[in-house]
Amino acid sequence: MPHQQMLILFGLLPVATNISTWWNFGSMLLACSSMQVLTGFFLAVHYTANINLAFSSIVHITRDVPYGWMMQNLHAIGASMFFICIYIHIARGLYYGSYLNKKTWLSGTTLLIMLMATAFFGYVLPWGQMSFWAATVITNLLTAIPYLGTTMTTWLWGGFAINDPTLTRFFALHFILPFGIISLSSLHIMLLHEDGSSNPLGTNSDIDKIPFHPYHTYKDLLMLSLMVLMLLMTVSFLPDIFNDPENFSKANPLVTPQHIKPEWYFLFAYGILRSILNKLGGALALAMSIMILLTIPFTHTSNIRSMMFRPIMQLMFWTLVATFMVITWAATKPVEPPFTMISQIASTINFLFLIMNPIAGWIENNIMKYN
């Protein structure tokens, strides 16, 4: 019976023949999610959510717990792998017009917001210098909200500064949010298979479909194998490549690091935040850098779905990718010229893409009409 169910699930799932490797990142994200939950559970068993013991408990996990170093590194580097996959997944959705499947896109964007919140809470848990100060800076942005800001910040912290109650609730949130992510991922997949996935040409996939198994399962397995290989290579040879040197010191509220910054996968949002000198303006720009993805399905005006046949939008898309990388790089630098100016220019171009999206569609439609 289970074998028959598997056949129904995979064998009879009709999928477009021409979907490329860029469509594999969904299954890779599922694998990353499973690994994060498993490694996270084993870490939670040994972790102590107390400001005096949290840092020591991480040291204990890496030194004394059998294979604890592997669990800790898999969890930390797995998070980076998760974000690499999700950013590629979103880029593919933008490039090939997958956002026109509105319900799937909106549930996916909600998933991204939940994932970013989970990763942020997780970054605070080791209670190192950068964990503490990144948490202080980011949560302090809530004070920019008029009238309610200070009350909300005090409520989130559980006091008048980041302390033991903050760490306890961040651990609780970091533990519970992945279950919400799993539930929403299931909904995301269900909504996707309501209409079926798109394809690189942006045409109706119903014309030419093949069973998911064995054709696409083997293609997925190849990419999964490559991802696991990269992950294990990084864990084995470069385990601290994504770590900040400041985070190897225990949190000290009396000593501020020279340059406070979050993990690399938040640097683009942090760079946009820093490029605006006003606190409320920066906080709004930070929120909009993610929330603006929600508007994309409603600003598509072109008669063509995929960017494969849209040269103007291709140019804009790759400009967006370049600005994303430039903002990420600039955010690692101190807040001084020329990095401030670079961040401001790149942030402006970043938001211009989303304003130009409907305009480029109208231009392309008119060019095709007159030809």
From Swiss-Prot:
* UniProt-recorded Gene Ontology molecular function terms: metal ion binding; ubiquinol-cytochrome-c reductase activity
Would you name any one GO CC term? mitochondrial inner membrane
Cofactor or coenzyme needed: heme b
Q: Per its UniProt record, what Pfam families does this chain match?
A: Cytochrom_B_C, Cytochrome_B
Topology versus the membrane:
Multi-pass membrane protein
Indicate which residues the UniProt annotation says bind heme b b566: H89, H188
List of residues binding heme b b562: H75, H174
Q: Which GO BP terms, alphabetically?
A: mitochondrial electron transport, ubiquinol to cytochrome c
Superkingdom of the source? Eukaryota
Tell me the compartments it is located in. Mitochondrion inner membrane
Which keywords annotate this record? Electron transport, Heme, Iron, Membrane, Metal-binding, Mitochondrion, Mitochondrion inner membrane, Respiratory chain, Transmembrane, Transmembrane helix, Transport, Ubiquinone
User: What InterPro entries does the record tag this protein with?
Assistant: Cyt_b/b6_C, Cyt_b/b6_C_sf, Cyt_b/b6_N, Cytb/b6-like_sf, Cytochrome_b, Cytochrome_b_C_euk/bac, Cytochrome_b_N_euk/bac, Di-haem_cyt_TM
Membrane-crossing ranges are 25-45, 69-90, 105-125, 170-190, 218-238, 280-300, 312-332, 339-358
Residues holding a ubiquinone: H193
Q: How is the cofactor bound?
A: Binds 2 heme b groups non-covalently.
Specify where it is mainly localized.
Answer: mitochondrion
Xref: PROSITE patterns: CYTB_CTER, CYTB_NTER
* Additional remark text: Heme 1 (or BL or b562) is low-potential and absorbs at about 562 nm, and heme 2 (or BH or b566) is high-potential and absorbs at about 566 nm.
Query: What do we know about how this protein assembles, alone or with others?
Result: The cytochrome bc1 complex contains 3 respiratory subunits (MT-CYB, CYC1 and UQCRFS1), 2 core proteins (UQCRC1 and UQCRC2) and probably 6 low-molecular weight proteins.
PANTHER family recorded = CYTOCHROME B (PTHR19271:SF16)
Which family is this sequence assigned to? Belongs to the cytochrome b family.
Question: Which protein, by its recorded name, is this?
Answer: Cytochrome b
UniProt source species: Eryx miliaris (Desert sand boa)
Q: Which gene is the coding source of this polypeptide chain?
A: MT-CYB
